[in-house]
Every structure is written in C-alpha cells, then in structure tokens.
Amino acid sequence: VLILSLGCENNQPDQFEKLLGDYDKSRIKFLVVQKVQGDEVEEGMKILHSLYDIASKDVRTECPLSKLRIGLKCGGSDGLSGITANPLVGEFSDFIVAQGGTSILTEVPEMFGAETILMNRCQNEDLFNQTVKLVNDFKEYFLSHGEPVGENPSPGNKAGGISTLEDKALGCTQKCGRAPVSGVLGYGDRLKTTGLNPVSYTHLTLPTNRE
C-alpha cells in the first residue's frame, strides 16, 4: 500500500502511522508530496515498483470461506436491479455468511423506506436498537444540513426506471440476502462478529451516490 499525503492536511502521516500499530514497513509505504525534491510522480512510481517486487513473491494459500469478508455497495440502481443483480448478490452474501464468513452492508441513505426489513432480521433487541439508531442518525444528519431525506435517487437512477427512494431502498436491501443481522458497525468501528453487519457509512468510505 502506498499512502499519499500532500503534507499540509490535518491528518498528518506521522499521526496516522501511529494508528497502524506494528505493521510491515516493507509493504506499507508513505509519500509526502511536499517533501519530494524532484518529480513526485517518478518518486511514487519507484515506491510502487518496490511494492510490486515484494508482492510478486507472494504465494497463494488456501483458506476457508469463514475467513472471507465482503463489502456490499452501490451498483448503479435502475428499475430492474432490485429483481435481478441485487438478489443475486444477496444469494452470494447468504452463501458466504452460511459458511461462517462476513458480509458488510453499506449505503445507509439508500435503505430509507425499507429499513424495517433489516430491523426485523436483527438477532436480538440490542441489535434492533442499534440498527434503528444507525438509520435515524443518518436521517438526522440529512435534516440538520437542510437536505431532504427522500431525494437520494440520482438522475441516472430515474432514467433507469427508479421512481422513489423506496424503490431504490427495496433494491438496496436485496444485496444482503436473508441472513440475520449479527452486528452493527459505527463509523470507524472494526468488525467484532462474523455474519451480516450493516455499517454506518456509505460506499465503504465515500459519500452516497448523487451521480
């Protein structure tokens, strides 16, 4: 991994590095652009080539599906994705969870209108309350910035046949299949349990789809 920094951000590389703990310095490199004396791109390419040389010596090893963690994100919703591609992704998610693996559902704003489907699948009352808070906190975030909650569908979504946020939400929740909710992740949380885990963010680390 090559971690790029301009050099003047609030999140400084030396502080960020402390959060990584004990890590393999041969596989994780930092490049601070403002400290490069010559060509930044050339310097970056040198580092990437060194990382490639290390990675090229790696050998694949078998591991059980219980070690697999998958992330479910936006796929560009249209009028058919909720009955075609998304249910197929859901079947795959269910298969991974059934083998002891982990599935992480993102896109909280795209769940608005179908969130009760997830709430009804929570394994216990505590998870139910966490899921309710997950959704309501995002709604409050929208409202606190003067943004309407129901205008998530983009022009591209509408051109493809999506008419309301509820249409999109029913498709979004298909991506996680029928597995019970076994954990709820807040922003920045680490996984604590296998199974299906909705996460309090979108696109795995990016703003929700407005394109």
Task: Please report, for each region that a protein language model flagged, where it lies by residue.
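Buried, small/hydrophobic-residue-enriched core segments of structured protein domains
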Residues: L2-V184
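Non-transmembrane, aqueous-exposed alpha-helical and coiled segments at domain scale
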Residues: G188, T193-Y201
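Conserved small/polar residues in nucleotide/adenosyl-binding loops
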Residues: T202-T208
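Acidic, glycine-enriched catalytic cores built around paired aspartates
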Residues: E211
